Design a protein with these regions (language model features):
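Flexible "cap/lid" loop of the alpha/beta hydrolase fold
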Residues: 109-144
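Catalytic nucleophile-loop/oxyanion-hole region of alpha/beta-hydrolase
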Residues: 29-31, 58-84, 88
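Short alpha-helix in the alpha/beta-hydrolase fold that links the catalytic acid
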Residues: 214-223
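Conserved alpha/beta-hydrolase
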Residues: 34, 39-62
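Gly/Ala-rich beta-loop-alpha elbow adjacent to hydrolase catalytic centers
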Residues: 96-100, 104
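Short beta-strand/loop motif that positions the catalytic acidic residue
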Residues: 198, 204-206, 210
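N-terminal cap/lid segment of alpha/beta-hydrolase-fold proteins
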Residues: 1-15
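Catalytic active-site module of serine/aspartate enzymes centered on a nucleophile-bearing elbow/loop
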Residues: 231-265
Length: 265
């Protein structure tokens, strides 16, 4: 699908008589194909799902692991939302995990045209790995490559999940500071500057044992946004990828329940 002059990998998962459309946004260095179980759970509950690979990731065209501006993912998602809304007269919900959680949170302070947002382990504040670049200035180091090291017993307590992550050819082995700094510094700064603009119903989820993005980030975000319809839940036995850890079935059930409650209003 052509979005902002780039061919994006976009896959629609259709159902009969859908209640709503859920658009999935994945995290840094991964791809949308890792969310099959969530797609299946949403389809089973009569939600059509649209998943896509972010710019610089997966099967989307263009240089991998790079980003010109933190604004690009927001505008890419916005155009996708407009396409989805033009094709189906249905409520639209956004789901995002980790950097994808940051992206949907940023979307929420920029646009107000979706019916709800589900934000999982969002990097909504400055993670420790990028703090040095905040001091130095990431734009001066945008050409530097960083090795992906998330699968270091930090993604999930299920070993097979980390093994599959490492073996997956669509996951990035390296990414550039232009991507990490652009999103985790520039994007985070933008989000926190505009928190008062966030008005969309939101469900915030986080692993209680997350060592990549501290759960305190989600608690902080929850407390700072002035939204009437907001919920938060921690999964105390899970690491960063709550959808791939030991509480994953409960997470999927909670997401469906949250959506059902709002779609039926």
């Amino acid at each position: 699908m052509l979005i902002n002059d780039t061919i994006f990998f976009v896959k629609n998962h259709e159902v009969e008589a859908p209640k709503a459309t859920v658009i999935l946004t994945h995290g840094i260095a991964e791809h949308s194909g890792r969310y099959e179980k969530l797609v299946d759970a949403l389809n089973a509950a009569s939600y059509r799902v649209v998943r896509y690979d972010l710019r610089g990731h997966g099967q989307t065209e263009g240089p991998k692991g790079k980003l010109k501006s933190y604004k690009q993912p927001i505008e890419d998602l916005h155009q996708l939302v407009q396409i989805v809304k033009s094709e189906f007269n249905l409520p639209v919900y956004l789901f995002g995990h980790s950097m994808g959680g940051l992206i949907v949170d940023m979307y929420g302070v920029t646009y107000h045209d979706v019916d709800g947002i589900i934000s999982s382990a969002a990097a909504s504040h400055y993670v420790k790995d990028v703090v040095p670049f905040k001091v130095i200035g990431y734009k001066w180091l945008s050409f530097v490559k960083l090795k992906t090291n998330f699968a270091d017993h930090k993604l999930s307590s299920i070993r097979e999940v980390e093994e599959r992550y490492i073996e997956d050819p669509l996951n990035l082995k390296y990414y550039y500071i232009s991507l990490a700094g652009g999103m985790m510094l520039g994007g985070v700064r933008y989000l926190n500057k505009h928190l008062k603009s966030f008005k969309t119903p939101i469900y915030i989820l986080h692993g209680g044992k997350d060592e990549i993005v501290p759960k305190a980030f989600s608690q902080r975000f929850y407390e700072l946004i002035d939204v009437l319809d907001k919920d938060i839940k921690f999964y105390n036995q899970s690491l960063h990828e709550i959808l791939n850890d030991i509480e994953q079935e409960q997470v999927r059930a909670d997401i469906v329940a949250w959506l059902d409650k709002r779609v039926k209003k």
